[in-house]
Amino acid sequence: MKLVFRWYGEKHDTVTLEQIRQIPGVEGVVGALFDIPVGEVWPFEEIMKLKETVEKAGLKLEVIESVNVHEDIKLGLPTRDRYIENYKKTIRNLAKAGVKVVCYNFMPVFDWMRTDLHKKLPDGSETMEYDHRLIEGVTPDELIKRVKEGSQGFVLPGWEWDRLEKLRETFELYKNVDEEKLFENLVYFLERVIPVCEECDVKLAIHPDDPPWSIFGLPRIITNKENIERMLKAVDSPYNGITFCMGSLGANPENNIPEMIRYFGKMGRIHFAHVRNLKFTGEKSFYETAHPSFCGSHDLFEVMKAFHDIGYEGYIRPDHGRLIWGEKARPGYGLYDRALGATYILGLWEAIDKMKKRYC
């Protein structure tokens, strides 16, 4: 297991590389170029600037999250081939810079969804919440306004405002795209990009849909064991893998997280993992909690044991944390609670490892 920590760069993050460097066990950061418009080529020189900044702090840059997929590719428009060519060029540039894994998603319009970015918990901390009843009662425009107000000026990944300016137009285009068509468009993309990944030795890791069900009538296709396996078999290459986000998949209690880790892990298709916990509050509703098992609805001991059982040697990061101790930061991405999560993950891993050596 290689423990990493997401970082949004000097321009966009309240957390510094010096602070990340002091978290025990963290080897590197998960980064991106947030100022490059979606669909454009990431310049090699800009990638190297980011890498040099990270390495100067004593950390590694081997995972990118995310190289976003242009909406025209998801929609299957005639213009998609140009954007796919740009994506391939970006992968080649990342490979030249030593990047090993690229995370991406294939969610239409919204990369992720929450209805409250600042839910107050009884202990005074703030967290993010999803209440499906609120989704059913608002328009997409109203929700975007609510999220923008709740972002407190931070740029939220997947919610870049320039991408959402043409919201109504984009929704109109998706009226002709159901789950089967979206899946076909994903396969079209992978069939052209994966050969470049094989050539460059860069693993492509799709992020599950967050949450793993349809919102506003938009199709969702990476939500459970069955459709993930279908995607992997459609383009059957070890370079076509997944970012196993237990929080996204775990929002559906029907997804058996430890079993899925073992299944896809034995296939060698988990290239990157996000670990966090959440608390169910109703059907299709939850809020995010601190990482320990007793704080949420998932048993993180069993989750980490599943990773250990498959001999996982890939990258793993603590996912969203609460805002605690008065910290002002991007929702879900403050320093303190994620640092606590990192040490909890590391502690579970050490305990599981030593238990096996002692009793097996």
Curated annotation (Swiss-Prot):
Keyword tags: Iron, Lyase, Manganese
Essential cofactor(s): Fe(2+); Mn(2+)
Keyword match Membrane: no
Pathway as given in its UniProt record: Carbohydrate metabolism; pentose and glucuronate interconversion
Molecular-function GO term, any one: manganese ion binding
E.C. designation(s): 4.2.1.8
Entries under Gene3D superfamilies matching the protein: Divalent-metal-dependent TIM barrel enzymes
Entry superkingdom: Bacteria
Keyword Ion transport annotated: no
InterPro entries referenced in this protein's UniProt entry, alphabetically: Man_deHydtase, Xyl_isomerase-like_sf
GO biological process, one term: D-glucuronate catabolic process
Catalytic activity: D-mannonate = 2-dehydro-3-deoxy-D-gluconate + H2O
Primary role: Catalyzes the dehydration of D-mannonate.
Protein name as it appears in the record: Mannonate dehydratase
Organism taxonomic ancestry: Bacteria, Thermotogati, Thermotogota, Thermotogae, Thermotogales
Gene assigned in the entry: uxuA
